């Protein structure tokens, strides 16, 4: 499906990315994404933190999960939109560069469902956590202070809401 809904979804996602850049700059908290861009019944799946349901739970997860990662960025590489479906390739980028000048980074993919009115009802982030830890080790990165700790047994059900 293409047309108005794809354009609307792409525009909403572009606004979400712009707001995320403000978050990364320290201007607003991660939870600020929830009020504007997610539905009340949103489902958000993170590979380390698992499934989070409802805007309030997702806002709490976002703030807790990003503690200690304030110097990381998450630049977009590309985004595809097909109707209500948005797929984005992005980077988990740590501070610094490798000796050859490349950034320390690991890829990530997000799958989102656009619900209309500028909001998303589903996001599933996919990344290789082993690779993220390898990049952390290679870079010598360590958090400046406390870091958010994921649950020991998160719900990893990626089923979208019906």
Where are these regions (language model features)?
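A structural signal for well-ordered alpha-helical scaffolds and beta->alpha junctions
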Residues: 9, 27, 55-58, 105
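A solvent-exposed, acidic/Ser-Thr-rich amphipathic alpha-helical stretch
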Residues: 30-83
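Phosphate-binding glycine-rich loops and adjacent basic patches that engage nucleotide phosphates
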Residues: 16-28, 52, 71-76, 96-97
